[in-house]
Amino acid sequence: MRLELIIILLISNSLISQNSLFNLEKTNPLDIPIILSGTYGELRSNHFHSGIDVKTKGIQGLSVYSYASGYVSRIKISHGGYGKALYIKHPDGTTTVYAHLKKFSSKIEKIVKSRQYKRESYEIEFFPKENEISVLKNEIIAFSGNT
């Protein structure tokens, strides 16, 4: 009984702390109700999950919105892992990662294509400067995919 109570308290504390960090009512990155497929701190085969994963009901091409204003701090495209991924650094010090994307917004896609042609490679990773690609809260930054 005591062990069950401790486990319940730990789970409750975890949920409360996640709720304060990720109030999905205010920060929904999609235009559909949030259904999580992965949660922060969830045990994976060889690590703890470091984010939340949102289900898209198998739909590709949904608009993906920025959680808050900031700037694109990293873009990585690879055949494995996250596939197309976008990292946005926010003024409060947090970084949000948007992964498994089908494509980026036209503003970002234009810069990505230019870098790909310059490097003659589909797979790229680069770190834009702070003033290079700024985004606003709720700006469309990408479209959902299945990579």
Descriptions of predicted regions:
Residues 10, 94-97:
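Charged interaction patches that mediate protein-protein contacts
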Residues 17-85, 89-95, 102-107, 121-123, ...:
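Surface-exposed, glycine-biased beta-strand/turn segments
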Residues 3-13:
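Sec-dependent N-terminal signal peptides
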Residues 111-123:
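A solvent-exposed, charged loop/short amphipathic helix patch at secondary-structure junctions
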